[in-house]
Design a protein with these regions (language model features):
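Conserved active-site tyrosine of GNAT-family acetyltransferases
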Residues: 76-78, 82
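A short, internal acetyl-CoA/4′-phosphopantetheine-binding micro-motif in the GNAT/acyltransferase core
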Residues: 35-46
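Conserved acetyl-CoA-binding loop-helix of GNAT-fold acetyltransferases
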Residues: 46-59
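Conserved short alpha-helix immediately C-terminal to the canonical SAM/SAH-binding motif I
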Residues: 53, 72-76
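Acyl-donor (CoA/ACP) binding surface of acyl/acetyltransferases
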Residues: 101-121
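Acetyl-CoA-dependent GNAT
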Residues: 1-33
Length: 122
């Protein structure tokens, strides 16, 4: 599986709506449409930008996963039916780490049509 680190202030970040005028942070985009958000700082607090960004990613078909979210972020994630899980992310952590994502259901999209082609993941 190929992963690409994407930061705000890059063309890849802008293509995902993760723009430097709204956020500071970084994520990893995998070629299987998993999107791991490791760090996000909103430049304009309480304006709904993080919520809108997550909504966009879900709508675009990404399997959005938030690593070690803050309490405020957890509140946002509950509204999108995210749940706490644990994953092993050996590139960044020695042990399993808290990752919030939506539980798969038979009715959930399988992310096969994600727009990963919009972003160079190689």
């Amino acid at each position: 599986m190929t992963k690409k680190r994407i930061e705000t202030g890059t063309s890849e970040g802008d293509a995902l709506g993760f723009s430097a005028d709204l956020f500071s942070g970084w994520l990893e985009l995998c070629d299987d449409c998993r999107l791991y958000l490791y760090c996000i700082i909103s430049r304009h607090r309480n304006e709904g930008n993080a919520r809108n960004l997550i909504r966009r990613w879900i709508s675009d078909g990404y399997d959005v996963r938030i690593v070690k979210p803050s309490v405020i972020m957890q509140h946002i994630l509950h509204k999108f039916s995210f749940e706490q899980f644990h994953e092993y992310l050996p590139d960044h952590y020695d042990d399993e780490v808290e990752v919030w994502r939506r539980r798969f259901t038979p009715y959930a999209p399988k992310y096969i049509s994600c727009p990963a082609g919009r972003v160079d993941t190689a």
